[in-house]
Amino acid sequence: MIDEKSIEFDFPEGILGFENIKKFIIKDSKYKPFSIMQSINKDVSFLVTSPFNFLSEYLPNIQEKDWSDIKAKEEDEKVILCIINMHVNDYKDITANLKAPIIINKKKLLGKQAICTNEKYSLHHKVFKE
Protein backbone atom coordinates (compact mmCIF):
# COMPACT_ATOMS: atom_id res chain seq x y z
CA MET A 1 0.00 0.00 0.00
CA ILE A 2 1.23 3.53 0.78
CA ASP A 3 4.44 3.72 2.80
CA GLU A 4 4.21 7.12 4.52
CA LYS A 5 2.07 7.84 7.59
CA SER A 6 -0.23 10.40 5.92
CA ILE A 7 -0.26 11.40 2.24
CA GLU A 8 -2.46 13.96 0.47
CA PHE A 9 -4.07 12.96 -2.83
CA ASP A 10 -6.05 14.97 -5.38
CA PHE A 11 -9.30 13.44 -6.62
CA PRO A 12 -10.24 15.76 -9.53
CA GLU A 13 -13.65 14.06 -9.96
CA GLY A 14 -14.25 13.52 -6.24
CA ILE A 15 -15.77 10.25 -4.99
CA LEU A 16 -19.22 9.01 -6.04
CA GLY A 17 -21.70 10.86 -3.84
CA PHE A 18 -18.98 13.29 -2.73
CA GLU A 19 -18.05 14.90 -6.05
CA ASN A 20 -17.34 18.30 -4.43
CA ILE A 21 -14.57 16.90 -2.22
CA LYS A 22 -11.34 16.89 -4.20
CA LYS A 23 -8.57 16.36 -1.62
CA PHE A 24 -8.09 13.42 0.71
CA ILE A 25 -5.32 12.18 2.92
CA ILE A 26 -4.70 8.49 3.43
CA LYS A 27 -3.34 7.64 6.84
CA ASP A 28 -2.72 4.56 8.93
CA SER A 29 -5.51 3.19 11.08
CA LYS A 30 -5.15 1.38 14.38
CA TYR A 31 -7.20 -1.40 12.78
CA LYS A 32 -4.75 -3.19 10.48
CA PRO A 33 -4.83 -3.81 7.52
CA PHE A 34 -7.22 -0.87 7.15
CA SER A 35 -6.32 2.76 6.43
CA ILE A 36 -8.38 5.94 6.70
CA MET A 37 -9.12 8.07 3.64
CA GLN A 38 -10.08 11.46 5.15
CA SER A 39 -11.17 14.60 3.30
CA ILE A 40 -8.97 17.54 4.24
CA ASN A 41 -11.68 20.22 4.13
CA LYS A 42 -14.86 18.33 5.08
CA ASP A 43 -15.82 15.90 7.80
CA VAL A 44 -15.91 12.87 5.49
CA SER A 45 -13.81 9.76 5.88
CA PHE A 46 -13.76 6.22 4.58
CA LEU A 47 -12.12 3.09 5.88
CA VAL A 48 -10.13 1.55 3.01
CA THR A 49 -7.86 -1.39 2.40
CA SER A 50 -6.26 -3.24 -0.46
CA PRO A 51 -8.73 -5.81 -1.79
CA PHE A 52 -5.78 -8.18 -2.13
CA ASN A 53 -5.63 -8.40 1.68
CA PHE A 54 -8.72 -10.64 1.62
CA LEU A 55 -9.18 -11.61 -2.05
CA SER A 56 -5.84 -12.39 -3.66
CA GLU A 57 -7.42 -13.21 -7.03
CA TYR A 58 -9.29 -9.87 -7.37
CA LEU A 59 -9.42 -8.89 -11.07
CA PRO A 60 -11.47 -5.70 -11.38
CA ASN A 61 -10.70 -5.02 -15.08
CA ILE A 62 -10.19 -1.29 -14.55
CA GLN A 63 -10.64 0.59 -17.84
CA GLU A 64 -7.44 2.02 -19.32
CA LYS A 65 -9.15 5.44 -19.46
CA ASP A 66 -9.52 5.39 -15.68
CA TRP A 67 -5.78 4.81 -15.23
CA SER A 68 -5.10 7.46 -17.87
CA ASP A 69 -7.31 9.97 -15.99
CA ILE A 70 -4.88 9.75 -13.06
CA LYS A 71 -1.81 9.56 -15.34
CA ALA A 72 -0.86 6.05 -14.17
CA LYS A 73 1.01 4.18 -16.88
CA GLU A 74 3.44 1.93 -15.03
CA GLU A 75 2.35 -0.88 -12.70
CA ASP A 76 4.54 0.46 -9.88
CA GLU A 77 2.47 3.69 -9.87
CA LYS A 78 -0.89 1.93 -9.49
CA VAL A 79 -2.67 1.19 -6.21
CA ILE A 80 -6.16 -0.26 -5.83
CA LEU A 81 -8.12 0.23 -2.62
CA CYS A 82 -11.68 -0.59 -1.67
CA ILE A 83 -14.04 1.19 0.70
CA ILE A 84 -15.01 -0.87 3.74
CA ASN A 85 -18.43 -0.85 5.42
CA MET A 86 -18.01 -1.47 9.15
CA HIS A 87 -21.49 -0.31 10.24
CA VAL A 88 -22.33 -3.79 11.48
CA ASN A 89 -22.80 -5.54 14.82
CA ASP A 90 -20.58 -8.53 14.02
CA TYR A 91 -17.16 -8.31 12.37
CA LYS A 92 -18.17 -11.24 10.12
CA ASP A 93 -20.63 -8.85 8.43
CA ILE A 94 -17.99 -6.30 7.37
CA THR A 95 -18.20 -5.75 3.61
CA ALA A 96 -16.02 -4.20 0.93
CA ASN A 97 -17.09 -2.30 -2.17
CA LEU A 98 -15.34 -4.26 -4.92
CA LYS A 99 -17.58 -2.84 -7.67
CA ALA A 100 -16.26 0.73 -7.39
CA PRO A 101 -12.62 0.60 -6.21
CA ILE A 102 -10.50 3.62 -5.43
CA ILE A 103 -7.55 3.77 -7.82
CA ILE A 104 -4.47 5.81 -7.03
CA ASN A 105 -1.36 6.96 -8.81
CA LYS A 106 1.02 6.90 -5.84
CA LYS A 107 3.74 8.82 -7.70
CA LYS A 108 1.61 11.69 -9.00
CA LEU A 109 -0.68 11.66 -5.91
CA LEU A 110 -3.86 11.45 -7.99
CA GLY A 111 -6.88 9.26 -7.40
CA LYS A 112 -10.38 8.49 -8.56
CA GLN A 113 -13.17 6.03 -7.98
CA ALA A 114 -13.45 3.66 -10.91
CA ILE A 115 -16.23 1.28 -11.87
CA CYS A 116 -15.10 -2.33 -12.10
CA THR A 117 -16.29 -4.02 -15.31
CA ASN A 118 -16.01 -7.52 -13.89
CA GLU A 119 -19.63 -8.50 -13.17
CA LYS A 120 -18.76 -10.99 -10.44
CA TYR A 121 -17.91 -8.25 -7.91
CA SER A 122 -20.45 -6.41 -5.78
CA LEU A 123 -20.82 -3.35 -3.58
CA HIS A 124 -21.11 -5.61 -0.50
CA HIS A 125 -18.47 -8.35 -0.68
CA LYS A 126 -18.01 -10.08 2.71
CA VAL A 127 -14.45 -9.52 3.90
CA PHE A 128 -14.32 -12.40 6.39
CA LYS A 129 -15.21 -15.96 5.47
CA GLU A 130 -17.43 -17.83 7.90
Swiss-Prot record:
Keywords: Bacterial flagellum biogenesis, Chaperone, Cytoplasm, Translation regulation. It holds the Pfam family FliW. GO terms for cellular component: cytoplasm. This is Flagellar assembly factor FliW. Gene3D superfamilies: BH3618-like. Interacts with translational regulator CsrA and flagellin(s). Its main location: cytoplasm. It is found in: Cytoplasm. One of its GO terms (biological process) is bacterial-type flagellum assembly. Acts as an anti-CsrA protein, binds CsrA and prevents it from repressing translation of its target genes, one of which is flagellin. Binds to flagellin and participates in the assembly of the flagellum. Belongs to the FliW family. Signal peptide: none annotated. NCBIfam families: PRK13285.1-1.
